[in-house]
From Swiss-Prot:
Protein's UniProt keywords contain Transferase: yes
Descriptive protein name: Uridylate kinase
Pfam families cross-referenced by the UniProt entry: AA_kinase
Keyword Transmembrane listed: no
Keyword terms: ATP-binding, Cytoplasm, Kinase, Nucleotide-binding, Pyrimidine biosynthesis, Transferase
Coiled coil regions in record: none
Organism name: Mycobacterium avium (strain 104)
Listed EC numbers: 2.7.4.22
Gene Ontology annotations of biological process type: 'de novo' CTP biosynthetic process; UDP biosynthetic process
Subunit structure: Homohexamer.
């Protein structure tokens, strides 16, 4: 399973009662600009820069998501698996690409289950749906069921990518957002947004606050893979690229505050 680099289950535990999430199954709070969002999380952030999971990072992300869910916003999530495996990189080391991509998909499921656990510790009922059937740990991906979960105030995490090799989790995020009727893809990164050049190599690079899908593709800006941007461009799906490492930024993104980079058609 591939996932672009940063720029520049139902679980086995006994079912828990539905929490009293305030507006979770009703209308979003007046502060929210969006009522249904698809949050794309890079797997590398879940590892805190290392291989594996950093529980402190996952817990912090879960708290941010729980905050917006309690405000009535419907949240679906796609997570990469880069903290465990990257199919393209394994291919470069001699592995067969299809097999290495499937290994990456399993990494996304591990991340999904971890986030589910921390969200439920926050009192947020969460379902994991996977594109590859694994009934003992997650539901199969069914878009209509996912929408029903969202309407009931549950978080839905989509694992195993598209279930197909050669497709990145960025592309999965775009496709799932369109299929569940999300209003925006919130693309969480480890940088403040889209820059004119890689800010780690070029300190003078400027943050771009607004740009079109077409310009991102034409300029070759490394935000997500071109397939994901083309899919969003063709279907008028906006993308907000923002820094996940700033606490509270998910709520700011949902509220429509001017953070990061807004990519529109």
């Amino acid at each position: 399973m591939t996932e672009s680099r940063e720029p520049h289950v139902a679980g086995s535990a006994a079912p828990r009662p539905e929490p009293a999430n305030g507006l979770a199954s009703g209308q979003p709070s007046s502060r929210a600009r969006y009522s249904r969002v698809l949050l794309k999380l890079g797997g590398e952030m879940f590892g805190g820069g290392q291989v594996g999971l950093d529980p402190d990072v996952v817990a912090q992300v879960a708290r941010q998501i729980a905050e917006v869910v309690r405000g009535g916003v419907q949240v679906a999530v796609v997570i990469g698996g880069g903290n465990f495996f990257r199919g393209a990189q394994l291919q470069q080391r001699g592995m067969e690409r299809t097999r290495s991509d499937y290994m990456g998909m399993l990494g996304t499921v591990m991340n999904s289950l971890a986030l589910q656990d921390f969200l439920e510790k926050e009192g947020i009922v969460t379902r994991v749906q996977t594109a590859i059937t694994m009934g003992q740990v997650a539901e199969p991906y069914l878009p209509l069921r996912a929408v029903r979960h969202l309407e009931k105030g549950r978080v839905v995490i989509f694992g195993a990518g598209m279930g197909l090799p050669y497709f990145s989790t960025d592309t999965t995020a775009a496709q799932r957002a369109l299929e569940i009727g999300a209003e925006v893809v919130l693309m969480a990164k480890a940088v403040d947004g889209v820059f004119s050049a890689d800010p780690r190599q070029y300190p003078e690079a400027e943050l771009i606050t607004a740009i079109s899908h077409r310009e991102v593709i034409d300029r070759g800006l490394r935000v997500a893979d071109a397939t994901a941007f083309s899919l969003c461009m063709d279907n008028g799906m906006p993308i907000l690229v923002f820094n996940l490492l700033t606490n509270g930024n998910i709520a700011r993104a949902v509220a429509g505050e001017k953070i990061g980079t807004l990519v529109t058609t």
